[in-house]
Structure formats: structure tokens, C-alpha cells
């Protein structure tokens, strides 16, 4: 009845089905892990953004690597901007995906330590080899607020470090490198400034990090597992159809043989 399953065509089809089922199950498990990872990241970012602001020195210190639970925490700092030694970070985009610079300004705290402040985005008006015109920050002693970020690395950001850049231009924000350049005690990580709010021609401040689309991974997980469940069902439907077609063909042959030959 089902001897046709031993034919070359059906053996190949069955082997393909047997390979597809575990592959699709594994893809579903991978999407499940992606969903859990993105959900955990979204929860971590949300709790950090909604936590009460704290002084930056409560979380950061010289040489300290900002942890995942500290990242995006709102911090405050009181001191003065050192615009004479500020730099720009190349190839950064704004909310409209326009390429420009981020303005990186050392902020000297009241105790003499320095924290790096990313004041926001400015357009790249002019040659990339020249230092752009940067709107000045508030003069004198000021209190700022922003999100604490970890030092940037090529591994984490995908941005390659480039040697021999024009003066006062960098590719990555790194507190250890800035400490050597400034000859100062620099806190680990940096601040993405959110207050005072940008006014007039001030740099465009960086918006809050968006949440990752975790539900999409959940939908893909369900989709792959439905595909995995559908493979044996589809295989069985094809088997039943093949059996029915063969039985109908055999019945027609018997009918033709039983009919009397014309006189």
C-alpha cells in the first residue's frame, strides 16, 4: 500500500522533511533567545531612564567601566565646560540620518575631576579636515543633566578607529584616551547631555534610546514553530494524495482489463 515510499523520489522528500523539522525548531529557539534578550534590554533601559537622577560621581570614577545597569542612568554634574579642549566625534548622524559630528566637551567638576560630555549633534558644514564651528555652551558654573554612557569601543559600536585624523577629531569616545590627552583625572564613561535643553544654534541633543522590537522576534518564533509543525502534516497530505492517485490508477487499469474486447 505504501511501498512507493521506498522509491528514490519519496526517500529524498522524506529526508528533506526530516531535516527541515529540527532546523525550523532551532530557528524558533534562536528567535526566542533574541526575544528574551531584547525584552531584558528594553526593561533595563526603561528602568534606568525612569530612575531618580544621581550625581555622576556616585556611579562613575576614574578608570571605571560603566556597567549595563548603570548605562542610561540619569546623572547630574556641576562645574564648567572646557571649550578650549573640546573635540568632535566624526561620522555621527542625527534623528534624520544626516551625517555630522558629535560635540565632545570636557566638563570640569567642582573638585577638579573631569567628565566627558557629549553635547549633541552639529552638521558637517565644510571640509572634514577642518574643525567645525561649534556653538558655545553656557559660560561659568552650571549644572547639567544627562544619560550616563559607557566608553565606546569598536567591538561594541562597529565603528573603526582611524589613525592620523585631523586635530581635535576622534572616531570613538573613550575616557582613558581623553585622560591621556587632557592630562587630567577623567571619570569613566561619558554623559549624553539632556539638560539644560538646547536653544537657538546649540547642538542638537541626542534623543532617548528607542526600544528594540522584541514582539517581532516573538512572532518569528511562533512562525518557525508553526512551519516545523506543518512539515509532517504536509508530508502526510502528500502521502495520502499519492496513495489515492495510485489506487485510482490501479482501479482504472482493472476496469479496462475487465471490459470485453469489441467484436
Language-model segments: residues:
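Surface-exposed, charge/polar-rich loops and edge strands
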Residues: 1-60, 68, 73-115, 119-263
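Phosphate-centric recognition/catalysis
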Residues: 65
Amino acid at each position: 500500500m505504501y511501498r512507493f515510499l521506498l522509491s528514490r523520489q519519496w526517500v529524498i522528500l522524506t529526508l528533506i522533511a526530516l531535516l527541515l523539522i529540527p532546523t525550523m525548531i532551532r530557528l524558533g529557539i534562536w528567535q526566542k533567545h533574541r526575544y528574551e534578550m531584547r525584552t531584558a534590554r528594553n526593561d533595563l533601559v526603561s528602568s534606568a531612564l525612569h530612575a531618580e537622577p544621581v550625581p555622576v560621581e556616585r556611579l562613575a570614577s576614574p578608570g571605571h567601566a560603566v556597567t549595563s545597569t548603570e548605562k542610561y542612568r540619569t546623572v547630574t554634574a556641576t562645574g564648567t565646560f572646557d571649550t578650549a579642549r573640546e573635540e568632535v566625534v566624526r561620522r555621527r548622524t542625527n534623528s534624520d540620518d544626516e551625517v555630522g559630528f558629535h560635540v565632545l566637551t570636557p566638563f570640569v567638576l567642582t573638585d577638579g575631576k573631569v567628565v566627558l560630555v557629549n553635547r549633541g549633534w552639529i552638521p558637517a558644514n565644510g571640509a572634514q579636515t577642518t574643525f567645525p564651528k561649534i556653538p558655545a555652551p553656557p559660560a561659568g558654573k552650571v549644572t547639567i543633566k544627562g544619560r550616563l554612557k559607557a566608553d565606546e569601543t569598536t567591538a561594541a559600536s562597529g565603528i573603526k578607529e582611524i589613525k592620523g585624523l585631523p586635530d581635535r577629531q576622534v572616531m570613538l569616545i573613550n575616557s582613558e584616551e581623553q585622560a591621556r590627552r587632557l592630562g587630567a583625572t577623567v571619570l569613566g564613561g561619558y554623559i549624553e547631555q539632556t539638560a539644560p535643553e538646547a536653544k537657538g544654534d546649540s547642538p542638537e541633543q541626542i534623543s532617548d534610546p528607542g526600544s528594540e522590537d522584541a514582539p517581532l522576534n516573538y512572532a518569528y518564533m511562533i512562525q518557525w514553530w508553526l512551519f516545523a509543525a506543518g512539515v509532517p502534516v504536509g508530508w502526510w497530505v502528500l502521502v495520502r494524495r499519492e496513495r489515492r492517485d495510485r489506487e485510482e490508477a490501479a482501479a482504472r487499469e482493472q476496469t479496462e482489463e475487465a471490459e470485453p474486447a469489441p467484436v
